[in-house]
Amino acid sequence: MSLASLARALSRRSAPSSSRARQGFSLGGLGGTTRSPPPPSSPLPSLHGGEGGGLGLGFVRGYLTAALGRPAAVKAGTDWRSILANPQFRRLFSDGSKKNYENYYPKGKKEAPKGDGSNKSDSKQDSSTDDQWNFQETASKQLQNFLAPLLFLGLMLSSLSSSSSDQKEISFQEFKNKLLEPGLVDRIVVSNKSVAKVYVRSSPQSNSQGQNTDAIITTNDVPSKHTPSRYKYYFNIGSVDSFEEKLEEAQEALGVDPHDFVPVTYVAEVNWFQEVMRFAPTVFLVGLIYLMSKRMQSGFNIGGGPGKGGRGIFNIGKAQVTKMDKNSKNKVFFKDVAGCDEAKQEIMEFVHFLKNPKKYEELGAKIPKGALLVGPPGTGKTLLAKATAGESGVPFLSISGSDFMEMFVGVGPSRVRNLFQEARQCAPSIIFIDEIDAIGRARGRGGFSGSNDERESTLNQLLVEMDGFGTTSGVVVLAGTNRPDILDKALLRPGRFDRQITIDKPDIKGRDQIFRIYLKKLKLDNEPSFYSQRLAALTPGFAGADIANVCNEAALIAARSEETQITMQHFESAIDRIIGGLEKKNKVISKLERRTVAYHESGHAVAGWFLEHAEPLLKVTIVPRGTAALGFAQYVPNENLLMTKEQLFDMTCMTLGGRAAEEVLIGRISTGAQNDLEKVTKMTYAQVAVYGFSEKVGLLSFPQRDDGFEMTKPYSNQTASIIDDEVREWVGKAYKKTVELITEHKEQVAKIAEMLLEKEVLHQDDLVRVLGERPFKASEPTNYDLFKQGFQDEEDSKNQEAAKTPQPDDDGTPSLGEVVPT
């Protein structure tokens, strides 16, 4: 019988049961004592609930009284009766609808609403009511699932723990003097050969008049004779033989006839509370393991993070795949990808083939098995793969290369098999493996792979799945990496990755397109096209991720300044923040150091201004940025694919301009030129030892490894000495020319330095006022020309608008829009 039906039955019988609770109905204890018949004036309620024949409260009270063997259980039963009879408590265990709330139950709404004139407010109210009821229903079901076991467990533990609270422990001497000598002992039950339970005769007056049954001892704490016995006292015995001997001696001393000796019975009882507590740690441990296994299967698991779709301990060999299809939300399309038109065209061929395979099959063409996206970090490899998933319209399975590696042996190959099996089941499909270099590294040689056995097994399984004996068509594999040089050659061969699509950093046109995409999402004071070209000119060498960071930094700076729109000043501050680091205006710098930095940066500006092949200066500042830079000069370099010897020489001179200015104008040098000297040394060594510009070294090239693990030089010591002497000579020539240039324009260098000390930041317009126009004109427009072109167009438009506004006549007659004071 369910708890709901039990509660309803108890509520129906609550009133009669409460009246019968005061009547003389008593059950014996566990020792088997018989009931005393009630007086004729008090009818005894039946065990099945009296007249109704149902399960009444008397049965529950009687059962609890018999089970606990104590009168206190009657009071506890009365308390439980009032709780169970509460309608709100019964409603927790009922699946039926509440009274007068049937219309609010979603399950009861089977008929469609009549008419179509319902307004939106009613529908919203109904939906909110349904959501509220769904939450209440879910909470109620969860409460039903947990409350019943907890209630039963609490009732059992409370009854078991307090079952012996009404029994009093006495000594054998007290038993002999107060109970055995007056002849009040009815019988003795020895439990488990250790405890002697004494059943004494209770007072008949306590049952007939409804008094407290705990008062079984009459005046002077002596019970009456010839009454039904109850278990009230107990004492511990050392051994059965000793107890029987002492009991027999005591009764013989009292002159009791052997036929009237107190009967002694031996029982083996189970203390349920002790048994439960003994098995409680084991049950708790088993339950904990069960809950952990359920949680691992639902999300928090081995081999995967928390969340939906995690791998359990029994599913650790399955790949955790992010699957997308045509119904997925938050898709990325090819129109959201810019700056890599050639790579996008190659990827779009895969999409076109999957959508229209007959067009290619009629020509005898086969779709490539895979394509490897290669490029520097932040160029949009993963974004291009997301666009492929959004445009293809076929299932797209994405996984990271590190997801194949696990602490268990054999998990990697198993996940590769599971991944391709899932892809073949929904073919045609696309698999994208991001950062494939985690499992695609070149295998070890000579059997000395060591700890890479698991990775090599995973790679072997990937090779077999892509182009092996049992390979099936319809699955295209895309992969992304920025380390193609370390991949295994077997992975790069045609038949597996047929194409290598290189995604380089965007040029100025690509950056313009990328800026247009990100600027559409910002609140600007002008159109996105107003900023895109000049920002593209200001950010040479920036990848797509860097451009996104610039836009985000500009928005943060505008929000920090409590601005409602983003302006060009915010974008320039964002670019300075990314290039130079965090601005530190509060950094403590002495006046002498600040003056040295000002002359150093002024030397860079003047040297670059009067050198033909030097990059044009955009801005110079002495505001400290980053961790070490006390000032910097920002240039707008041209993205030249080829560099001449003269260009490199002028760039070397410009880099040495700060050191030359310190020597010429201040008269002493500082450590501020350390970074400049490092750049000059690297640039000059490249000219001599790599580019073949030196006549003494000849047409030889010794490129250095980028990783710095080159143990031996690929040339002799004599050649190394020639290279060192040549580099030293070239740097000396460049520095000599720079000193002459700074000496020639000493006054201008000092004037710019004083302006820097006053303003801290100078732009090209300030330099033009001091130095005049640059004496060199480029034959083709440079990045700086493109940057200035936007401002020139803005000034022209303002001038045109000013020309269109009406002007006052010469005779003093006011125009239409002029206000004349009176």
Curated annotation (Swiss-Prot):
InterPro entries for the chain: AAA+_ATPase, AAA_lid_3, ATP-dep_Zn_Metalloprotease, ATPase_AAA_core, ATPase_AAA_CS, FtsH, P-loop_NTPase, Pept_M41_FtsH_extracell
CC cofactor: Zn(2+)
Binding site for ATP: 375-382
Native species: Oryza sativa subsp. japonica
Compartments where found: Mitochondrion
GO cellular component: m-AAA complex
PANTHER family tied to this protein: AFG3 LIKE MATRIX AAA PEPTIDASE SUBUNIT 2, ISOFORM A (PTHR43655:SF2), ATP-DEPENDENT PROTEASE (PTHR43655)
Name assigned to this protein: ATP-dependent zinc metalloprotease FTSH 8, mitochondrial
Class of enzymatic activity (EC top level): hydrolase
Binding site for Zn(2+): 600, 604, 676
Membership in a protein family: In the N-terminal section; belongs to the AAA ATPase family.
Function of the protein: Probable ATP-dependent zinc metallopeptidase.
